[in-house]
Amino acid sequence: MSLSLPSPSTNGSRLTPVESRHAPLFGFALLTVSCALASFALACATPFAAFAVIAAAMLPLRPALLVVTGAWLVNQGIGFGALHYPIDGNTMLWGAAIGIAALAATAAASAVLRSLPQNSTPLVLAVALICGYGVYELALLAATPVLGGADSFTAAIVAQIGVSNAAWLIGLVAACEIVRLVNPFKRGHIAS
């Protein structure tokens, strides 16, 4: 069984679960709920590269960056508020580094999605994830000389988090497709 996604809409989006006017709000809701789930389940391994690809596939770059920033803020709020991350300079700087890395991943995913052909969406989403994840991890690795933690960048750990991001991307694409199929926001749809 192959994934058959609709062709991109006139605004260039690869994922169109809702009309383009609802896309920023839907993207924000999808990623903040997903981020809350991931933050409690995975703590520091929140799949921001997958979030970046979903946002970039649904939205132009600026709204995608805003949506990913919102997801990052949710992650930080849960981390410091509910999970009781230590409130110290190093932890806060790592939080900022994660936010910067997530935004860099979003920009990279957006560039990939804009530059590759509009057909073959599943393959292009995979390429966008690989590029976005690479940028995300490199941005975090660049912070290690100042913040420490280089021992967390072993091949096994990076691969495990990469697989987690791939699984989250598949799940988020599936959620988008389900919403597209049962979209309550379609024109002419009357709520019962």
Predicted feature descriptions by range:
Residues S2-L59, P63-L66:
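Hydrophobic transmembrane alpha-helices
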Residues S39-A105:
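Alpha-helical membrane segments and adjacent membrane-interface helices in multi-pass membrane proteins
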Residues L25-A29, L65-T69, G95-I100, A126-I130, ...:
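Hydrophobic alpha-helical transmembrane segments
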Residues A111-S192:
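Membrane-embedded alpha-helical hairpins and interfacial helices in multi-pass inner-membrane proteins
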Residues L31-F40, G70-L83, I130-A142:
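Aromatic-anchored segments of alpha-helical transmembrane domains
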